Regions:
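Catalytic cores of peptidoglycan-degrading enzymes
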Residues: 19-149
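Non-catalytic extracellular/periplasmic "stalk"
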Residues: 1-26, 30
């Protein structure tokens, strides 16, 4: 392969492609302003929440390096993967972790298991995409059949 093609393939392998969850029940909360599930008013939600059974495996949506794995406040047990080129993904509310910081993961690599840790109303995966540190709507990186209402 040519060096240019190798770089292009590397970009595609590292670009987030959206979560794949067994037994998923669809999106329960979208990116953007939403009703606060814990009280009155509205709040900004910085990702997508996917309904899934407790203990379902959670996989990396792109190749990268785990930069955080542990307790992350409102996200509970969570994993952050750096995909380079300004992309990071966050996987929150996990019940158990399967990775540690510094570990390289491939797209589809096991990160942990669905839970309800942190600020959570029940078992689900909070999936966030960040571009240069700013949260962006993950739907831009998903097949529409994964989030259509």
């Amino acid at each position: 392969l040519t060096p240019a093609l190798e770089r292009t393939l590397g970009v595609e392998r590292s670009r987030p492609a959206g979560p794949r969850l067994r037994g998923r029940g669809g999106v329960t909360s979208y990116f953007g302003r939403r009703k606060n599930p814990f009280g009155p008013g509205v709040e900004f939600h910085d990702g997508l929440d996917f309904s899934a059974p407790y203990g379902a495996p959670v996989y990396a949506t792109g190749a990268g390096v785990v930069v955080q794995a542990g307790w992350m406040g409102v996200y509970g047990l969570a994993v952050v993967v750096d995909h380079a080129r300004g992309y990071r993904t966050l996987y929150g509310h996990l019940s158990r972790l399967a990775v540690r910081p510094g570990q390289r993961v491939a797209r589809g690599g096991l990160l942990g298991y669905v839970g309800s840790t942190g600020r959570s109303t029940g078992p689900h995966l909070h999936y966030g995409v960040y571009r240069y540190g700013t949260p962006v709507d993950p739907r831009a990186y998903l097949d529409p059949t994964w989030y259509t209402r």
